[in-house]
Swiss-Prot record:
One of its GO terms (biological process) is cholesterol efflux. It comes from Rattus norvegicus. This is Apolipoprotein C-I. The keyword Signal applies. The gene is Apoc1. Residues 1-26 form the signal peptide. Gene3D superfamilies: Apolipoprotein C-I. It is found in: Secreted.
Length: 88
């Protein structure tokens, strides 16, 4: 029974292997790959830039970052005032 099922499957697999790749799967030639390389690199750079900007904005909008930034600003202003009153 197993041989009865395995033999047609084996024939189909061998036929597919001998047929070769489909036209859509064929590898592009080297010159066309090199021509499209600058466009692909530019697209990759733009995508990377967008993701980096989004990540930076996300970090800027986090509550802990806002609180930390405010604390540093307040502390710096207090130090400036103390220096002004001390040396004025």
């Amino acid at each position: 029974m197993r041989l009865f099922i395995a033999l047609p499957v084996l024939i189909v697999v061998v036929a597919m292997a001998l047929e070769g790749p489909a036209p859509a799967q064929a590898a592009p030639d080297f010159s066309s790959a090199m021509e499209s390389l600058p466009d692909k690199l530019k697209e990759f750079g733009n995508t990377l830039e967008d993701k980096a900007r989004a990540a930076i904005e996300h970090i800027k909008q986090k509550e802990i970052m806002i609180k930390t930034r405010n604390w540093f600003s307040e502390t710096l202003n207090k130090m400036k005032e103390k220096l002004k009153t001390t040396f004025a």
